[in-house]
Amino acid sequence: MRALAAAPLCALLAACASGAAEPRFTVVTVDPAHQRLQLFLNDEQGRPYRRLEKLAQALAKHDRKLVFAMNAGMYHADFSPVGLYIADGVALSPLNLAHGKGNFFLRPNGVFLLTDAGARVIESSELPALHDKIHLATQSGPMLLSHGVINPVFDPGSRSVHLRNGVCAVDGKAVFVISEDPVTFHAFARYLRDALKCRDALYLDGSVSSLYSPALGRNDHRAELGPIIGVVAD
């Protein structure tokens, strides 16, 4: 494992690559109690950022630094979110409980959210019963893990491999994971369960999966992106 060497955030933002057998993963842990975790979609002109680097440049104009960023859920051709999107407490896209084709609609899908209690991942169907004030939320799918159980739709023998990224929550902290090698859904979920001790984990996307982290020397650009999640420092 290698630790993030970005003082003064080294004690708060931990990143590592698994150094054992393939496949490899990079893990970034964010503590919302000490770090500013935000969702981003459009710039000041209402245009989608599309690239992690463009978001970093826009923040820099206001003397703010993008410490970490990752694609944060699935999106339409116009880059708008497929499902729930809440930024700064304001819902810009509603919860999507429809049936359809594609990974987003594989059951169950879920929501990553941030409340005063910290980060959480829940199944989408559970959201209407949640009464906590939500500061940010992004809906995606499918759930990789629910209550410690790998999604039963995943085939351990599948040959469908892609770069993938996802998120879980451990003790109120957000744990973001991106694979450095193409992996199956099952292998990805198993890593989050066994190596990271996640109980509920959400798939964010595959193939387009991208990471921004100056401390790790990362500025990925695999595709144009919709929702982006990141840590911002002044």
Regions found by a protein language model. Name each.
Residues 31-33, 78, 113-118, 146-148, ...:
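Short acidic-glycine loop/turn motifs at beta-strand connectors
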Residues 16-103, 177:
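Zymogen propeptides
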Residues 80-149, 154:
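Active-site-adjacent helix-turn-beta-strand microarchitecture at beta-sheet edges
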Residues 6-15:
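Bacterial N-terminal signal peptides
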Residues 79-98, 153, 157-169, 173-200, ...:
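Conserved, well-ordered active-site substructure
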Residues 1-4:
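Positively charged n-region of N-terminal signal peptides that target proteins for export
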